[in-house]
Amino acid sequence: MSPSENNKRIVKNTLMLYIRMILVMGVNLYIVRIVLQVLGEVDYGIYNVVAGVIVMISFFSGTMSSASQRFFAFELGKQNKEKLKKTFSVTVSIYLLLSVIILVLLETVGLWFLNNKMTIPADRMSAANWVFQFSILSFLMTMFAIPYKSLIIAYEKMSIYAYISIFEVGLRLMLVFALTLLQYDKLIVYAFLMFCVAGLTFFLFRFFCQRHFSESKFSFIWDGSLFKSILSYSGWNMFGSLAAVMNNHGVNILLNLFFGPVVNAARGIAFQFSNGLNQFVQNFVLAIKPQVTKYYAAGDNENMISLVYRSSKFSFFLLLLLTTPFLLESSFIMTLWLSEVPDYLIVFLQLIIVNTLVDSLSYSLLTAAQAQGKMRRYQIIVGGTLLMNTPISYLFLKAGYEPQVTMHVGIIFSFLAMCLRLLLLTRLIPLTIIGFFRHVFLRVMIVVTTSTVPLFYFVSMFPEGTMRFVISATGGILITILSISFFGVTKSERSSLWLYFRTKFPVW
C-alpha cells in the first residue's frame, strides 16, 4: 500500500478515534460529577486511591498491551498470517500466566498494604476491601481484553474499537444513574457495577475478533523462541511501565499518606480530566502506531521518521487547541462543572495540562523505540529517570511543601525523559536531534509563544465571568489555529490539510 493511501487511512482512523474520544471524554466528565455527588469527597477519594493500588501493582498489563500491538503489527507488516496466529496464542498464554502472578500479588502484598498502610477512615475500611476485590476482578477482565484490542488495532479497525468504547462509556453512564436509585452502600455498588462493565466489554472485543479474525482462535502452542522474544521485549517495557505507574499512582499514595483522601479526591478529579487529554493524544498515536511498526518491518526508514516527526508535532498542536480554554479559564470551568470545587483542584488541573503537553511530544518517540524492539538500554535510562519522581516528591512533601509540588517535579521529569528518549533514539534509528529540533520542537515553541502569551495578557485585563470565558475560549482557539497555520506546519502540510478539509467539508 502506498504512503498516500496509508496517510488517508491514518486520517480516517484518527477521525474515528477522535469522535470516540469526544463522546467518551464528555460522558466521563459528566460521570465524575455524578459519582462525586453520590459518593462524596471521602468515598470518591477512597475509590480513587484503592483502585490506584491495583494499577500500581499490576503494571504488567500495560507492558503486554504494547508488546501485543508491536508483535501483531510486525507480523502483518511481514504479511505472515501463520506466524500471527501463533503469536496471538502465545500472547494469550502469557496473559493467563501473568494473571495468576498478579492475583497472588494483589491478594497478599496489595491486601496487606490496603489494611495496614493506607489512610482510610475506620468506618469505611470494610467498604474499601470490597472495592479492592471488585477492582481486582475489573482489572483481570480489562487485561484479558488486551490481546483482542491489540489485534483490532494491528488490523487498523479503529471504527470497531471506537464503537465498543462508546458502548462501554454509555453503559457506565446508565449504571451510574442506577447507582443514585440504589439504597445499599454506594461505594461498594459502584465498584461492582464497574466490574460488570469491564466484563461485558471483554466479551464484546472477544466476540468481534473471533467472528472476523481467524488468528484470534486461541489454542495452546508452545514456541520457546517466540515466548522468549515477547517476554524479553515485555521485560524491559515492564520496567518503563513501572516507572510510569509510580510516576502517577505512587505520587497518589504519597498524597494519601501526607494529606488524606480529600486531596486524593481533588487529584483524582484532575486526573480524570488528564486521562481524557491523554486519550486525545493517544488516539492520534494509536492511529499511526501500526504504520510506524509496519514501515520499520518493511525497512522504510524515511517514511517512518517522517511520520514520527509529524505525529509528535500534531499531537502537541491538537492538545494545545483543546486545552487552551482550560488553561485560561480553569477556575470558571471547574466552578461551572462542579457544585463545590475541592481544594487544590484548580492548580492540579493547570499543572497536569502542562505536564500532558510536554508528554505529548514523547509519545511518537516511544512508538518508534517500540517498533525497533531493542528496549533494554532505552528503558533502563528513561525508566530509571522517571522512577526518581516518587522519591524526589516524597522529599519535598517531607520538607513541608504543598501537594502541588509533586506536579512541578513531574513536569521537570517529563521534560528530562523527552530529552533522553530523543538522545537514545538517535542510536537506534536514523533520527537526528537537529531534525527533531527543526521539524518539531522549534515550531512548537514558536506556536506556544505567539498564541498563549497574548491570550494570557488579554485574560488578565478582564474580570472572571461568562463573557470573558466565551471571548477567551473562542479567541484562544482561533489565535491558536492561526499560529499553527503560519508557524507550526510546512507549506505542503498546510496545502494537504486544506485540500482534505475542502474535500470532506465543502462550503459550496
Predicted regions: what they are:
Residues 36-38, 42-43, 159, 170-203, ...:
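Membrane-interface helix-loop junctions in multi-pass transport and translocation proteins
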Residues 12-29, 193-205, 209, 224-294, ...:
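Transmembrane helical elements of multi-pass membrane transporters/channels
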Residues 2, 426-437, 453-508:
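Membrane-proximal transmembrane or re-entrant/amphipathic helices at the cytosolic face
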Residues 1-28, 82-90, 126-128, 220-241, ...:
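N-terminal membrane topogenesis motif
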Residues 35-56, 87, 187-192, 226-234, ...:
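Interfacial/gating helices of multi-pass transporter permease domains
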Residues 62-78, 154, 213-214, 270, ...:
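Helix-loop junctions and terminal segments of transmembrane helices
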Residues 140-165, 177, 188, 353-384, ...:
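Membrane-interface junctions at transmembrane-helix termini in multi-pass inner-membrane proteins
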Residues 1-10, 187-193, 205-248, 287, ...:
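Interhelical loop/hinge segments that connect adjacent transmembrane helices in multipass membrane
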